[in-house]
Amino acid sequence: MASKEAELEALLYAAGDDGLETENLLQLLEISPAALRELANHLKDRLKNDENSGLQLICINQTYKLTTSPKCGDIISKFFQKDLSKNLSQSALEILSIIAYRQPITRVEIDDLRGVNSAGALQTLVWRGLIKVDGKKDVPGHPNLYVTTDYFLQYFNYESLADLPVIEEFEADDNPVNLFNQDDSRNKEINFDEGE
C-alpha cells in the first residue's frame, strides 16, 4: 500500500497543469489540513533536495501542483521552443504590471494609461502564458478583458495576487504648480550677449 505522500504525488501528477485544490486533496487523502501541510512540505523538500528529480511542488491560490523545476528550465525551454529565460522588455513589464494591478482590463485601457499602442507586447505576454483573455467588456465593440494567469504567479514566485507589492496611490494635486514663479531665485534671466 502506498504512503500518503506517494498518494499525494500521484494525485498531483494525474491532475497535471490544473493541480488540485486543498479541499479536494483533503477529501481524497482523508487527512486534516495540518497533515496535508506536513505531507506537502515533506514532498516539496524531497523533490527540491533530490538532484535526480526534475519536479517541484508549488501551491498557488490554495491549489497544489507538480511542475518542472527551474533547474531544468533550459531543457524544458528547448522542448517547447520558447525561451522562457529571456527577459521581458520594459514595455512588456510595464503592461504586465498594469494588468496585475488593474485586472480585468482592456487593451484600449492599457493604451490610454501608457499613451502608446500595446498590442505587440500583449501578444508576447499571452504567448508566454503570463496573461490571458478572460471574457469581454460589456461596452460597444466588446473588447477582450486581460487578466494574469496562475503561471504569472508561479513565474514571479507569488502564491496569490495579494502577495503583489503594494503600490502607493498618488493623488493628483488640485493646485496647479507654476514652474516659472517670478519670486523664485532659480529662475534668473538668461542673457545671450554675443561673445560670452
UniProtKB/Swiss-Prot annotation:
- Please name one Pfam family that this protein belongs to: SMC_ScpB
Principal localization? Answer: cytoplasm
Annotated InterPro entries: ScpB_csome_segregation (IPR005234), WH-like_DNA-bd_sf (IPR036388), WH_DNA-bd_sf (IPR036390)
Provide this UniProt record's keywords sorted from A to Z: Cell cycle, Cell division, Chromosome partition, Cytoplasm
Which SUPFAM superfamilies does the record associate with it? Answer: Winged helix' DNA-binding domain
Q: Which GO terms describe its biological process?
A: cell division; chromosome separation; DNA replication
Q: Where found in the cell?
A: Cytoplasm
* Entry keyword annotation includes Iron: no
* CC annotations in GO: cytoplasm
How the protein assembles, per its UniProt entry? Homodimer. Homodimerization may be required to stabilize the binding of ScpA to the Smc head domains. Component of a cohesin-like complex composed of ScpA, ScpB and the Smc homodimer, in which ScpA and ScpB bind to the head domain of Smc. The presence of the three proteins is required for the association of the complex with DNA.
Which PANTHER family is this protein grouped with?
A: SEGREGATION AND CONDENSATION PROTEIN B
Q: Which purpose does this protein serve, as stated in its record?
A: Participates in chromosomal partition during cell division. May act via the formation of a condensin-like complex containing Smc and ScpA that pull DNA away from mid-cell into both cell halves.
**Family of the protein in this entry:** Belongs to the ScpB family.
Stated name of the protein = Segregation and condensation protein B
The species this protein belongs to is: Lactobacillus johnsonii (strain CNCM I-12250 / La1 / NCC 533)
Top-down, what is the taxonomic lineage of the species of origin?
Answer: Bacteria, Bacillati, Bacillota, Bacilli, Lactobacillales
The gene name on file is scpB
